[in-house]
Structure formats: structure tokens, C-alpha cells
């Protein structure tokens, strides 16, 4: 059961139709469409260079000498747009760095000019960072920690952590509710 050679058109393709000079044949929809919808140059009028009108079997209208000019925007978008975006980001980063550096320089200059405005080293120190203790007697004999009443190793903790009851089965629900003082 051998089949003959397959057609390039496919089984359900319509018969080749000639297109008018203002239209180009589109292989995707297999019909004549306006050439402006395709990225092809306008078809040349039939003259000495074209022996017959173009048909569906002659898709040279969609690929030809003008295909290079139509494909130019694609590499420009693929390489040009990311390059411009990268340059814009680098420029923004440089500007942010310059602004922060200038602010830091101003702050350092302002601090140095505030320390010695007249060059007088005997000037009183500003009281911005001086801590003033309240008057009173400090109790130097008070212990830092109260003495332990009981040994913490032998006393049970005041709270309990719920653990799963494995002897009842693995499907038992364990809640985090703790026992209050009335239940102990």
C-alpha cells in the first residue's frame, strides 16, 4: 500500500490562485492578502522580468531581495533595546552614586566646620551628646541577681509542653492548650 509523492500544498489546501498586483499570497492562510499586512515590499508590476503572474505555487513574493530591509528592525530591537536599557541603568546608578557622595562630603564638611567655627580650641563642647545622670545615691550593695530559692535542676517547670500521646495512636489530636493553675 504505497502512496504517491506528497504534495507541497498539503491535503486540504485550496487550488493555487493568482493574486492581483496589489496583493501577495500568504502561505499561512493560503489566500491573497494585502501586501501591507506582510513584511514584504510591494510587488513589482508584471513586465519583462516576470514571465507569468504569481500563484500559490510561487511564494517568491514573500521572500525576495527586499526581505533584508524588512528584517532590519528585528536585530535593532533584539540588541538595541537591551543596550539602551542597560545604558540608562548604568547612568542612573552613576547619578545616585554621585548624589550620595556629595551628600556625604557636605555632611563631613559640616561636621568639621561645626567643631571649630573660629579655629578656637578652647570653645565649650556642644551638649548634644552629653549624658546627664539624675542626682541620687546609687545602691552599690544591691545584688545584680536575686539569690535562687531552689535548685533549678530539681524543680519542675511552671508550664508544660504538649506532646503526642503515642500509646493512644497516631491519629490523636494534640493541642497547645496548657493547664491552668486550677487544674494542677
UniProtKB/Swiss-Prot annotation:
TNFR-Cys repeats lie at residues 18-35. Residues 43-62, 107-184 are annotated as: Disordered. It holds the Pfam family BaffR-Tall_bind. It comes from the Eukaryota. Residues 168-184 have a biased composition (Polar residues). One of its GO terms (molecular function) is signaling receptor activity. The chain crosses the membrane at residues 79-99. InterPro entries: TNFR_13C (IPR022338), TNFR_13C/17 (IPR043521), TNFR_13C_TALL-1-bd (IPR015336). B-cell receptor specific for TNFSF13B/TALL1/BAFF/BLyS. Promotes the survival of mature B-cells and the B-cell response. This is Tumor necrosis factor receptor superfamily member 13C. It comes from Homo sapiens.
